[in-house]
């Protein structure tokens, strides 16, 4: 946890902090010359200005780091009082209704922000993670005055260890909990259930079709697969609406099987005027899907290798 009682921006940078951060960055192999260290406009962070590179924003303990230029939000600041700040323990939880309301009021000039935009607390109190409905992530100060398209990485034992995995997993679990379970097409394990995965899929994605061919085998190994309709290809929204419009889950599974295994699309019945795909697709924006199929364990961990390799079953704990 970050033991800071106030924003770094409220302080000048002490000699001890300056020295500590320089030491941390030298140990992890930062080659660029450090020009200066100053309070960041992101709460509880310091800005490290580098020669020839975008600045770093880093916590006083040197654990959490972001690289990127901060953009000043052009919107008028309508809410001056920032709501109560979260703690590191809330990382990966959706922000409170009060925080979301104040953020959106202060982002009125940004047309791609809406009540559907997901925002989450991060491990850095006062720094919020958000994503557009297209799934593009960004970070912002909780007063919504400064935004960057960077991500929060972690430094541990003198090494960059990549993105904050604890945050990512907790965020993804928050997203799963928000999904309408009745609009997931679920393929239950056909033996004792040993694992549950969520898969963001598109009927026209070649790798999604390849994964779907493994469905019966996965189910037989005790894996329950919950499918999130995540159309990316141009033709997919209408085609997937037809599948999700089928009357019951068995019919939906059959229609999805036909699309994935035979390339046959099932049209929506004339009586179905509801879009059952988009609500969960929008809720899933917080997953920040880069490509389909995106495969997650129910503990929120994203699988990042080939599902055709033995590693996949190892990842699921069912090898």
Listing of model-derived features with the role each one plays in the protein:
Residues 1-18, 197-212:
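Short, thiol/selenol-centered motifs that function as redox-active sites or metal-ligating centers
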Residues 3-33, 85-115:
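Short, non-transmembrane alpha-helical segments in secretory-pathway proteins
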Residues 25-28, 32-67, 71-72, 106, ...:
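C-terminal cap of thioredoxin/glutaredoxin-like
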Residues 49-98, 102, 153:
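Mid-chain, structured segments of secreted extracytoplasmic proteins
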Residues 78-88, 168-175, 217:
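C-terminal low-complexity, charged extensions that often adopt amphipathic alpha-helices
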Residues 144-163:
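P-loop NTP-binding catalytic core
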Residues 157-186:
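N-terminal "domain-start" segment that seeds a small globular fold
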Residues 187, 193-273, 285, 290, ...:
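Structural alpha/beta surface segment adjacent to cysteine/selenocysteine redox centers
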């Amino acid at each position: 946890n970050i033991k800071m009682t106030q924003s770094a921006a409220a302080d000048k940078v002490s000699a001890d902090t300056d020295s500590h951060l320089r030491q941390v960055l030298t140990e992890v192999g930062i080659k660029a010359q450090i020009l200066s260290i100053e309070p960041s406009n992101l709460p509880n962070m310091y800005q490290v200005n580098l020669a020839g590179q975008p600045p770093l924003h880093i916590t006083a303990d040197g654990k959490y780091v972001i690289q990127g230029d901060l953009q000043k939000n052009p919107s008028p600041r309508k809410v001056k009082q920032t709501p109560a700040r979260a703690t590191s323990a809330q990382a990966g939880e959706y922000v409170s209704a009060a925080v979301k309301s104040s953020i959106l009021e202060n982002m009125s000039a940004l047309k791609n922000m809406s009540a559907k935009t997901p925002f989450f607390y991060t491990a850095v109190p006062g720094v919020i993670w958000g994503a557009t409905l297209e799934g593009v992530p960004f970070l912002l100060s909780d007063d919504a005055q400064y935004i960057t398209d960077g991500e929060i990485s972690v430094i541990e034992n003198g090494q960059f260890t990549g993105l904050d995995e604890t945050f990512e997993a907790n965020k993804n679990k928050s997203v799963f909990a928000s999904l309408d379970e009745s609009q997931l097409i679920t393929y239950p394990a056909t033996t004792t259930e040993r694992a549950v995965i969520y898969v963001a899929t598109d009927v026209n994605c070649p790798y999604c079709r390849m994964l779907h061919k493994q469905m019966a085998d996965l189910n037989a190994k005790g894996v329950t697969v919950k499918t999130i309709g995540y159309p990316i290809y141009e033709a997919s929204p209408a085609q997937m609406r037809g599948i999700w419009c089928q009357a019951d889950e068995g019919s939906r599974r059959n229609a999805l099987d036909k699309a994935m295994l035979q390339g046959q699309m099932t049209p929506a019945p004339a009586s179905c005027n509801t879009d059952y795909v988009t609500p969960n697709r929008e809720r899933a924006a917080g997953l920040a899907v880069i490509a389909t199929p995106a495969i997650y364990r129910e503990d929120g961990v994203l699988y990042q290798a080939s599902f055709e390799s033995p590693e996949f079953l190892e990842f699921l704990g069912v090898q």
